[in-house]
Swiss-Prot record:
Heme b b566 binds at H97, H196. The chain crosses the membrane at residues 33-53, 77-98, 113-133, 178-198, 226-246, 288-308, 320-340, 347-367. This is Cytochrome b. The cytochrome bc1 complex contains 11 subunits: 3 respiratory subunits (MT-CYB, CYC1 and UQCRFS1), 2 core proteins (UQCRC1 and UQCRC2) and 6 low-molecular weight proteins (UQCRH/QCR6, UQCRB/QCR7, UQCRQ/QCR8, UQCR10/QCR9, UQCR11/QCR10 and a cleavage product of UQCRFS1). This cytochrome bc1 complex then forms a dimer. One of its GO terms (cellular component) is respiratory chain complex III. The lineage of its organism: Eukaryota, Metazoa, Chordata, Craniata, Vertebrata. GO terms for biological process: mitochondrial electron transport, ubiquinol to cytochrome c. Its cofactor is heme b. The gene is MT-CYB. InterPro entries: Cyt_b/b6_C, Cyt_b/b6_C_sf, Cyt_b/b6_N, Cytb/b6-like_sf, Cytochrome_b, Cytochrome_b_C_euk/bac, Cytochrome_b_N_euk/bac, Di-haem_cyt_TM. It comes from the Eukaryota. Its main location: mitochondrion.
Length: 379
């Protein structure tokens, strides 16, 4: 008798995606982050759903409803901090996943890569809107500053900002629509994940060598399912440590002060994972220029397949490219640090230099060094 998982129309799809999927035998733990992101998305949707049952998206009661969740709802504090710190874990996994793609040349699968960029933007938009919902000081002023950036768009900018706000400032209408979109977007993300996987399974996974591995495949289950479960367990442990021992480590103390439009905090800054882009935005004195640099800092990923000049796909055997890759990582960490600092000397000049280095590395130095490596190998 034929196994039901291979004949049933629905089970067959699951089987071909998660059980009998031929997978390169050489893929390392850097390939774990895709499944970890799926786990993160699951955690976020579940905790978010239960939080939405108790949250009210009204400026008069939003802050109070979050307090009520933490104090009066059974395990509400756990839900709230799992959701807040789960977002941080989500973005850490996302950055590592993108970094893996850059290092091993996974961007050569352009469809999968482009859907991934769409996912990155969707997650960033969701995280930003989620940050506004507790309606603390940083929520309110963060929303004001970031949405105001759209006013830099010529001609339609001001109208666009007021249309997003639903009035002449960030107010009740803004909070309500941000809650609606924050609730909706994770489901759109889940649909995009399916598209991402659909494109990935058309080509099969890349591997650390960057060499086609059709001759050396193993089934996804049990080999990689066990590996993914270990990764998920490790991540869950880190998340629980964060939630139970220092839940506010990655948050902003200003967000425990209710939103007050009449009192501006001394340093307005977004969540820690947006600080690198915020630093690039601040390093350009012109408003429109800053906004363009901010968008390009992420959109530059879409150019990666075009900027690939090496004859080898992966950086595994390219030591010069590896040096530049890790310089890029160090540069992003520097930008993250600068984004959290006040706008004063010497932070301004460090931010400007780090921003120039970021774009130079990706657009100029890395493609050039790849050509040099080709020459050294007489290719």
């Amino acid at each position: 008798m034929t196994n039901i998982r291979k004949t049933h129309p629905l089970f067959k799809i699951i089987n071909d995606s998660l059980i009998d999927l031929p997978t390169p035998s050489s893929i390392s733990s850097w390939w774990n982050f895709g499944s970890l992101l799926a786990v993160c998305l699951g955690i976020q949707i579940l905790t978010g759903l239960f939080l939405a049952m108790h949250y009210t998206s009204d400026t008069a009661t939003a802050f109070q409803s979050v307090t009520h969740i933490c104090r009066d709802v059974n395990y509400g504090w756990l839900l709230r901090y799992m959701h807040a710190n789960g977002a941080s874990m989500f973005v850490i996994c996302l950055f590592l996943h993108v970094g893996r793609g850059l290092y091993y040349g996974s961007y050569i699968y352009t469809e999968t890569w482009n859907v991934g960029i769409l996912l990155l933007f969707a997650v960033m938009a969701t995280a930003f809107m989620g940050y506004v919902l507790p309606w603390g000081q940083m929520s309110f002023w963060g929303a004001t500053v970031i949405t105001n950036l759209l006013s830099a768009i010529p001609y339609i900018g001001t109208n666009l900002v007021e249309w997003i706000w639903g009035g002449f400032s960030v107010d009740k209408a803004t909070l309500t629509r941000f809650f609606a979109f924050h609730f909706l977007l994770p489901f759109i993300i889940a649909a995009l994940v399916m598209v991402h996987l659909l494109f990935l399974h058309e080509t099969g996974s890349n591997n650390p060598t960057g060499i086609p591995s059709d001759a050396d495949m193993i089934p996804f289950h049990p080999y990689h399912t066990i590996k993914d479960m270990l990764g998920a367990l490790t991540m869950f442990l880190v998340l629980l440590m964060l939630v139970l021992f220092s839940p506010d480590l990655l948050g902003d103390p200003d967000n425990y002060i209710p939103a007050n439009p009449l009192n501006t905090p001394p340093h307005i800054k977004p969540e820690w994972y947006f600080l690198f882009a915020y630093a690039i935005l601040r390093s350009i004195p012109n408003k429109l220029g800053g906004v363009l640099a901010l968008v390009l800092s992420i959109l530059i990923l879409a150019l990666m397949p075009l900027l690939h000049t090496s004859k080898q796909r992966s950086m595994m055997f390219r030591p010069l490219s590896q040096c530049l890759f890790w310089l890029l990582v160090a540069d992003l960490l520097t930008l993250t640090w600068i984004g959290g600092q006040p706008v004063e000397h010497p932070f301004i000049i460090i931010g400007q230099l780090a921003s120039i280095l970021y774009f130079s590395l990706v657009l100029v130095l890395m493609p050039l060094i790849s050509i040099v490596e080709n020459r050294l190998l007489k290719w």
